[in-house]
């Protein structure tokens, strides 16, 4: 009889331990699933943002290409003017703007 009681107590402790482990695992699973949902939503939002940025880059590239073609046409139509150097004061004025990309001018330019 005492062995039976000890065996029942041991089985009860093992069952409680297993139940506790199951509850903890189930709780961790719920937390992980919530994190997966959050990360999936974040990834989808980033994909939308990336697609929007790609579209804007293509639009800017198209506008840049159009403007480049217009400048090239204007220069071709005004070859005598286009073949002369741009005056230093004009270069300085154009390059002294935010976002302007100009080569460094030496004093002899």
From Swiss-Prot:
One of its GO terms (cellular component) is host cell plasma membrane. Its main location: host cell. Residues 27-63 form a coiled coil. The keyword Transmembrane applies. It comes from the Viruses. The chain crosses the membrane at residues 1-17. Component of the spanin complex that disrupts the host outer membrane and participates in cell lysis during virus exit. The spanin complex conducts the final step in host lysis by disrupting the outer membrane after holin and endolysin action have permeabilized the inner membrane and degraded the host peptidoglycans. Host outer membrane disruption is possibly due to local fusion between the inner and outer membrane performed by the spanin complex. This is Probable spanin, inner membrane subunit. The lineage of its organism: Viruses, Duplodnaviria, Heunggongvirae, Uroviricota, Caudoviricetes.
């Amino acid at each position: 009889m005492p062995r039976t009681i000890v065996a029942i107590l041991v089985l009860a402790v093992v069952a409680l331990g297993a139940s506790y482990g199951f509850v903890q695992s189930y709780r961790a699973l719920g937390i992980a699933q919530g994190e997966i949902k959050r990360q999936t939503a974040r990834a989808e939002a980033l994909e939308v943002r990336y697609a929007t940025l790609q579209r804007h880059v293509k639009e800017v590239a198209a506008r840049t290409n159009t403007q480049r073609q217009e400048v090239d046409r204007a220069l071709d139509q005004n070859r005598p003017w286009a073949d002369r150097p741009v005056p230093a004061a004009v270069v300085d004025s154009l390059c002294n703007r935010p976002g302007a990309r100009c080569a460094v001018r030496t004093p002899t330019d």
